[in-house]
């Protein structure tokens, strides 16, 4: 009996110590040699243009690839079904496509940390009766198949049994919003951020009742073999959150689109079609190092592209220059469109060059525009004030908070240059950013319709007035 027990125990120990052969490829993930990111096209997700790639998800993906020290490969898909299948088949490493957290996605995938929040809203067009709720509709809802909107409608149908909708697979969210504006469909559902961005180009869009509130936008990872990537993503997310990157990207893509003026947006789109062609070449010629569309957007904010514009304060012309500024940069006739554009471009380029190198390239234009509006000295006051409040003086998102304080005695009495209408400067910059985004969209649409047209190189042919010739204390 003793020998039998000994043999049994020995056999068990030998078995326990024996190396088990497994297919390691099934359990151990291969080291990434590149980060393959599946995505969808959209202005807040991923877009390509002559000015480079952009989008909240794209910018974060670039940073994540840098964090992992591997090349980034963006892999766009035309619909969600293909995107999901690609992730399940290990053709991509993750999905970064502006997708919200939903019960169905939690069951199928691993969800990354929250990037930002959105509401789901019912969308209709200007001129239709405003629906009070989902049961008060005068037409049919059309949504994208396999989207979170289908999940929302399915839940609502439990309370509204007569609720029906159409699902389509060959369109994306942007196309459905365009179909609303063009009266091709009655209603759709969209994320609030998408509506805010797209109504700059489609001003007839209207947001109706909120169907789901404060949904987290997340990245999707495979349900298995993604432990290492998830841990790296969480560490990266914590790093970027502490660094203020998420706040910066939220401000970059969404901070200037919340304010919306229906009449102004329609008027701007008409002006792009009817007025801008007369002056486009001048903007391209004199932009210098600027994107000519930013210069044109600034001019529209200043004068609505009216070369004879005047104000009660004495500023005049396409770029609304003051007499001292015009004299200093050699502009003799502020009401001459070309002279005014040349002078305004010179001033803006000068402001950009004067800014401290610590301000990131992507944000220098917004600081320069604020200087163009209220003067460089007041912007410097605001930067110092931001620093004293433990905010980042080199981040536009923080300067936006501080500039309005220059109107309050409690704060401006501590500054070198005193009172300034800082809230006006914030509104000024945000308006130009909205005009610029709209102009870029219209310009890109035109290039798609006329691909044989080459972009103009005139901007590089005639240099702007040399930088460093303007007084930093004065606004334009």
From Swiss-Prot:
Residues 451-460 have a biased composition (Acidic residues). Its EC number is 4.2.2.n1. Its main location: membrane. SMART domains: PBPb. GO terms for molecular function: peptidoglycan lytic transglycosylase activity. Residues 446-476 are annotated as: Disordered. GO terms for cellular component: cell outer membrane. GO terms for biological process: cell wall macromolecule catabolic process; cell wall organization; peptidoglycan catabolic process. Residues 258-476 are annotated as: LT domain. It is an enzyme of class 4 (lyase). The active site is at 302. Keywords: Cell outer membrane, Cell wall biogenesis/degradation, Lyase, Membrane, Signal. InterPro entries: Lysozyme-like_dom_sf (IPR023346), MltF (IPR023703), Solute-binding_3/MltF_N (IPR001638), Transglycosylase_SLT_dom_1 (IPR008258). Residues 1-22 form the signal peptide. In the N-terminal section; belongs to the bacterial solute-binding protein 3 family. In the C-terminal section; belongs to the transglycosylase Slt family. HAMAP family: MltF. The N-terminal domain does not have lytic activity and probably modulates enzymatic activity. The C-terminal domain is the catalytic active domain. This is Membrane-bound lytic murein transglycosylase F. It comes from Shewanella baltica (strain OS155 / ATCC BAA-1091).
